[in-house]
């Protein structure tokens, strides 16, 4: 499969993305000797994982992304029992960060990610690594935008990076304990 989205200098359109074909995973793992397998079940890189046209809207008008393809994950898990599965592009794009960015001069309309309950479900299955880099970037950006909005005369990175580091720590702690099921597994 191929993930849609943008990461570094690589861009894959939604039209060019595809889901993992479970019938191909055993041969792929055997031929490559990989020690984990990143599969495509509907995740996407970046903070704009889905276009508004790919989503529905709830009663409040908030975008609701399409569900992940757990049928693909379950079939891959049956074919590769116990094999470590990875999900790239799995940031939840917390709306609190998006709202804070927008409130402090940012422009991130319709940024949406993977719902935490779906990530929690994936972590309970055979997924052992869930990549959430965009959530880290959003935590940092929201904190720094808020800081400079409240302290426009400051310029010392030690001042604005301190709350940014704390925002990342808090978000990662929440994800590890409440979403990814990593608490006590170090």
Predicted regions and their residues:
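C-terminal alpha-helical cap/extension of soluble enzyme domains
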Residues: 103, 114-186
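A short beta-alpha structural unit
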Residues: 86-90, 128-129
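Alpha/beta enzyme core
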Residues: 1-84, 95-100, 104-112, 116, ...
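Short, ordered loop/turn segments at secondary-structure junctions
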Residues: 1, 42, 89-91, 135-137
């Amino acid at each position: 499969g191929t993930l849609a989205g943008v990461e570094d200098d690589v861009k894959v359109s939604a039209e060019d993305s595809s889901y993992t074909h479970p019938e191909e995973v055993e041969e792929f793992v055997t031929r490559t000797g990989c020690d984990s397998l990143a599969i495509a079940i509907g995740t996407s890189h970046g903070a704009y994982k889905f276009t508004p046209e790919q989503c529905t809207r709830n009663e409040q008008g908030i975008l609701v992304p399409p569900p992940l393809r757990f049928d693909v994950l379950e079939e891959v898990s049956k074919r590769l029992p116990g094999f470590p599965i990875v999900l790239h592009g799995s940031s939840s794009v917390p709306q609190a960060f998006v709202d804070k960015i927008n409130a402090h001069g940012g422009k991130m309309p319709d940024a949406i990610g993977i719902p935490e309950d779906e990530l929690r479900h994936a972590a309970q299955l055979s997924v052992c690594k869930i990549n959430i880099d965009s959530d880290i970037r959003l935590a940092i950006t929201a904190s720094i935008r808020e800081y400079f909005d409240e302290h426009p005369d400051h310029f010392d990175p030690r001042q604005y990076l301190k709350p940014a580091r704390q925002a990342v720590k808090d978000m990662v702690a929440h994800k590890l304990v409440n979403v990814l099921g990593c608490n006590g597994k170090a």
